[in-house]
UniProtKB/Swiss-Prot annotation:
Keywords: Antibiotic resistance, Cell cycle, Cell division, Cell shape, Cell wall biogenesis/degradation, Hydrolase, Peptidoglycan synthesis, Periplasm, Signal. This is D-alanyl-D-alanine carboxypeptidase DacB. The active site is at 69 (acyl-ester intermediate), 72 (proton acceptor), 310. GO terms for biological process: cell division; cell wall organization; peptidoglycan biosynthetic process; peptidoglycan metabolic process; proteolysis; regulation of cell shape; response to antibiotic. GO terms for molecular function: serine-type carboxypeptidase activity; serine-type D-Ala-D-Ala carboxypeptidase activity. It comes from Haemophilus influenzae (strain ATCC 51907 / DSM 11121 / KW20 / Rd). Its EC number is 3.4.16.4, 3.4.21.-. Residues 1-26 form the signal peptide.
Length: 479
């Protein structure tokens, strides 16, 4: 019995020494740090030491909140799993006719597949291939094949008053110059006079209105409103103070098919190719002999731009491209939701009652808990050797959307924190990684919703956020 007691005592001493040799993880007191934020702000935060497989902070980690552009993390992982790195968006010219004596006897089919980076210049170069093949006249119709996508070209829950803004341009199958154009306003007029609106000739768009220059008494109460009419016509209303230099306003294209068709016809004329047919917009995929094609940059390049610059067009184009490739049918935003969830759930990601309405995070319908986003970050960390996604995250103080993030641009956070941002009105989110003082990888998710500083000037309204993030991530670094 004495011998057994000695063994037991020795074993207890050994276990005690082992327990003291392991690192201890006291949860970061996020609650106290949130006192720096404006009253009424809602915060969800969760962090995990990846090396130690230990949650080191959890404050409202299970609460559903607006994910904003951190949603692009879901899109990036799903795209990596559903599409290979050689994936490229293809814009193609096809025909069901024959080329003879300088004539294309048949329809010209232009197949768009949602290339979010297609430019007017690239489209012109593509159409110029027809001229190189000796085509001088098209004896048929212009057929736009946009069948890769279906239903609306905007997600459910996109704010109506943002729909004319270029960051909200429809990520349609036919997407030229991000489906964005600009008009120039000359308001160097006397009070009461009408502002001159000029649309550059390359845009097949009409912008009109009765905007007037206001005097100094009325100017503080002025605002400009845009009303969208059919056939890509825009009416600008309101007033503004006198501006001594012309300035530009950017608008989102509303009817993307009509916009693309008009640009194609103009470019055919510029190339000296005669066309007098109709424009057809069939719902079904069109077949024909390939005449020429243009390819976008490959998937890794698209993802890097999407993540670094928070490019909404790329995100939502990939969102539906994933669905098209996954289900082999025309993709709506709703089908994109099903595809992304299905792909990630197969990797063990649990969405529960989460709502995913789009790939960009623009929708106010999106509801995600910090712990769900954290599970995707964990998946990235564990599979980075094949995903290569960490290199796409913005780097604090270096590039992307956190190059100037006030709370992260000083040591030890600068060049250390990598994170996808998420911003809507009242929303300041981060989802990413950092290396702590011991050299261990830490994944974190910060969701701040309902952030409002009332009437504070824009220069000072972020001061509480900067202080909160500086304190929080310095604490996280110590753990």
């Amino acid at each position: 019995m004495k011998k057994l007691s000695s063994i037991s005592t020795a074993l207890g001493s050994f276990l005690l020494s082992v327990s003291f040799s392991l690192p201890t993880f006291a949860n970061i007191n996020v609650s106290d740090l949130t006192q720096k934020l404006p009253e009424g702000s809602n915060v969800g935060f969760i962090a995990k030491n990846i090396n130690q497989n230990q949650i080191i902070a959890d404050y409202n980690g299970s609460t559903f909140m607006l994910s904003a552009s951190t949603q692009k993390v879901f899109t990036a992982v799903a795209a990596k799993l559903a599409l290979d790195d050689q994936f490229q968006f293809e814009t193609a010219l096809l025909s069901n006719g024959k080329i003879q004596n300088g004539n294309l006897d048949g329809n010209l089919i232009v197949r768009f597949t949602g290339d979010p980076d297609l430019t007017r210049g690239q489209l012109y170069s593509l159409l110029a291939e027809l001229k190189k093949q000796g085509i001088k006249k098209i004896n048929g119709d212009l057929v736009l094949d946009t069948s890769v996508f279906s239903s609306h070209d905007r997600g459910l829950g996109w704010i109506w008053n943002d729909l004319t803004m270029c960051f909200n341009s429809p990520p349609a199958a036919a997407n030229i110059d991000n489906n964005c154009f600009y008009a120039e306003l000359d308001a160097n007029k006397n009070p009461g006079e009408i502002v001159k609106i000029n649309v550059p000739a390359q845009f097949p768009i009409q912008v009109f209105g009765q905007v007037y220059v206001a005097d100094s008494n009325e100017a503080p109460y002025c605002q400009l409103d845009v009303v969208v009419h059919d056939n890509n016509r825009y009416q600008v209303k309101g007033c503004l103070a006198r501006q001594y230099k012309p300035f530009g306003l950017s608008f989102a294209v509303q009817n993307t098919d009509a916009y693309a068709a008009e640009i194609i016809q103009r470019q055919l004329r510029q190339l000296g190719i005669e066309f007098n047919g109709k424009v057809l917009l069939p719902q079904k995929p069109q077949q024909g002999q390939l005449l020429a094609k243009h390819l976008s940059k490959p998937l890794p390049d698209l993802l890097k731009k999407m993540m670094k610059k928070s490019d909404n067009q790329i995100a939502d184009s990939l969102f539906r491209a994933v669905a098209f490739n996954y289900y082999k049918r025309p993709a709506s935003f709703q089908l994109g939701t099903l595809a992304v969830k299905s792909i990630l759930q197969k990797q063990g990601i649990r969405f529960g009652n989460s709502i995913l309405a789009d790939g960009s995070g623009l929708s106010r319908h999106n509801l995600v808990a910090p712990k769900t986003m954290l599970s995707v970050l964990e998946y990235i960390a564990k599979n980075e050797d094949k995903l290569h996604l960490m290199e796409t995250f913005p780097i604090a103080g270096v590039d992307g959307t956190i190059s100037g993030r006030g709370g992260l641009i000083s040591p030890p956070l600068v060049k250390n924190v990598i994170a996808k941002t998420g911003s809507l009105k009242g929303v300041y989110n981060l989802a990413g990684f950092m290396t702590n003082a011991r050299g261990e990888k830490v994944a974190f998710v910060q969701f701040i919703n309902g952030y409002s500083t009332g009437d504070l000037e824009s220069k000072t309204k972020r001061a509480p956020l900067v202080q909160f993030e500086r304190n929080l991530y310095n604490e996280l670094y110590k753990y």
